[in-house]
Amino acid sequence: MNNRRVLVLGSGVTGKSAAEFLRNRGDYVIGVDGSAEALHSCHFFCERYLDSAEEFPEDIDLCVRSPGIKTSHPFVVEAKHRGIPIVTDIQLAFQDPEFHRYPSLGVTGSAGKTTTVLFLVHLLRSVGMSACAMGNIGFPILQAMYQKGIRVVEISSFQLAEQEIEIPVLSAAAILNISENHLDYHYTLQAYTEAKSHIAKCLQSPESLWVGDGVSFGKSYLEATREINLVLDKGSALKPLYLHDRNNYCAGYALANEVTKIPLESFLQAVLTFDKPPHRIEYLGEKDGVRYINDSKATTMSSVEKALIAVKENIIVILGGRNKGSNFASLIPVLTQTVKHVVAMGECRTEIAQALSSSNLPLTQAQDLQEAVHVAQSIAQPGDVILLSPGCASFDQFRSFEERGDCFKQLVGEMEALKI
């Protein structure tokens, strides 16, 4: 397994973790990236190539593709042409004995992955079990797998795309839902769905795959936890819960029960004590009768729709950013039922305006988030809700959806007398 010549595509957080992992196992690691600065910031590379180079390194035994590197990348295409095995950090970890020391659970889907993973870790710990989150959640799996406890792995479609090998390591997994997403990467919904389905290749048993909306195979966690979901709904006085939150918690409950028996009372207590991560329909407060909600994590049409349904009415919604290949016209039915004004911001503001032109909804374009908030505030009246739910990536103005959400909070927080 060692002394191989391994090509690592991408020198971001994941690429660096892969390079470190491989070097520690005696491999000769060659890095490829579009940035010379990024390449030289990783001292685990033995050689470095800019991805604009026409020359493909010789005698490569393995290619490791970082999630941000498309499967259409010239180096990926050339590796396929030469018959070189291509894996991601997920497959590297799943094949390593270190990962196998504890049971593992996998979570993928179009929306709700991070919330489900964090809740699952919280739930397992609440009943006295060791558990740790890793993967696409921000803790690279090749570094985090050295922790003790049940591995709860968030897995993106980028990490599963074109997986060919079967690695039966996961005790159970969930595809929470599938809706139109990342079409700028996968190009078609079929390819995106196929990528998500590859998580089944990582299961010890096909009977341990739980699925939600938009998935036609596997066991429905929504059906299996229907009565528990109703309990959560009726118990909302104890803690207000949106439907998608209840679904995420029920998915976590189904997965947790694959590795240990969770009493219903323990599950309900875990729901009560769980702090949902920020930027997900996050209530910020009220000023002059206008409520403010930060849903910066919403980068898909499905997520925006869920937010609009949750908030219900009198909404001034801020949409926009960098489109990921979505069709905003698909939002017209729910927008017309819930929204009084649309503020379209950022790189794709004109595209949004054109897509929604047949709806006759009032719409104002804004160059950036700061202007969008100003426009929304100038329109809002007591009883209205200003909802940031962009339906787009943030990269036209920000480095991440977190930075975008924090900027929104700062803009809102600059108002005096905001009531939380």
From Swiss-Prot:
Entry's EC annotation: 6.3.2.9
Gene3D superfamilies documented for this protein: Mur ligase, C-terminal domain, Mur-like, catalytic domain, NAD(P)-binding Rossmann-like Domain
First-listed, main subcellular location of the protein, grouped into a coarse class: cytoplasm
Pathway(s) where this gene product acts: Cell wall biogenesis; peptidoglycan biosynthesis
Similarity comment: family membership: Belongs to the MurCDEF family.
HAMAP family from the UniProt entry: MurD (MF_00639)
This protein's name: UDP-N-acetylmuramoylalanine--D-glutamate ligase
Protein species of origin: Chlamydia abortus (strain DSM 27085 / S26/3)
Gene: murD
